């Protein structure tokens, strides 16, 4: 009985040092060593663990590393290749902002007149716009300037009753689209 217990101790001690094939824990056919194919035990090549929720591929082959060692191995490999996720993120952010950077001094200016009957008159003469810019802000009632785009847009304010009436007319898909657009424009915080 002491021989059997010594045998299992040596197998347990050597589990972290040797691979599954050396420990005879793997069986390619159902008759190898009296163990079924469901009893195969994997050990991590780096740390020797046998319990992990996810096995990852490593230098020793597929599913040879535990989750933690697989992540470490991937990070080391990426660092060796010169691929850093931080640099990628910075590049992505800078590329996104380059599209919206406009030179406001060279942007074409438009003058928008709102006529009483609801029509909008657009004048693209820059001299008129520059003269009107020096006037007081009270003349710009109902017009909002979008600085990022360099032009003026009329702002129409609706009463609460009109908003509710319009909201009722919209279907479920249209309401969802309006809410998504509001979230993407950062006008509503979730």
UniProtKB/Swiss-Prot annotation:
Question: Which family does the similarity line name?
Answer: Belongs to the type IV zinc-finger family. Class B subfamily.
Species of provenance? Arabidopsis thaliana
* Keywords assigned by UniProt, alphabetized: DNA-binding, Metal-binding, Nucleus, Transcription, Transcription regulation, Zinc, Zinc-finger
In residue numbers, the zinc fingers (GATA-type) are 38-92
Q: Please state what the protein is called.
A: GATA transcription factor 17
Q: Which CDD domains does the protein's record reference?
A: ZnF_GATA
Domain of life (superkingdom): Eukaryota
Which residues fall in a compositionally biased region of kind Basic and acidic residues?
A: 1-14
By its UniProt entry, which PROSITE patterns does this protein fall under?
A: GATA_ZN_FINGER_1, GATA_ZN_FINGER_2
Q: What does this protein do?
A: Transcriptional regulator that specifically binds 5'-GATA-3' or 5'-GAT-3' motifs within gene promoters.
Tell me one GO molecular function of this protein. zinc ion binding
